[in-house]
Amino acid sequence: AQGSKGAVSADGPEMPGRVQVNKAFIGFLTHTGFAHGGNGYEAAAFLIEQFKDTGLKAADDKNHGLDLDAMAMEYSNKYKAYKAEQKAIGNLEYAKVPCINHPIFKGKDVNFDPREEFVRKLFKGKGIGNVFLDYYHSIVNAMFKAKVSKNVYCVNIDAVIAVILLKM
């Protein structure tokens, strides 16, 4: 089979670059699970919960009027208390914030997933706003300020997938 599984149609073009967009999108949807790439599912649920009472009408509205840093700090303080409570009772399988941190892109004072960074710069260059992606960056900074983390985690590529799909 040419290309990635799920991205090549049954009548199959031999060049992956010729796969039709609709078939590539369906391939992505059918081959993304909860283990890898699927963390975006949890991210969408997380963001829906965070924004449910904000009155946000459109994710690309740059004049949304929300104080993302304050929202992120409030969440980070609640998360810090939750994490401490869970650790105190011996639960190390407590809920993690989806789509932040990465086993490869870590260990620096401020961490970046280069794939997410590329997309974020691309969005900025094209004038595309996404309040959800901006909120994710507020979250990783607030978690550091609230001493939930020892450094600024990266926002990983699964977050990008989630915020784009959620914006749709």
Question: What are the functions of these language-model segments?
Answer:
Residues 1-168:
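Hydrophobic alpha-helical bundle cores within soluble ligand-binding/oligomerization subdomains
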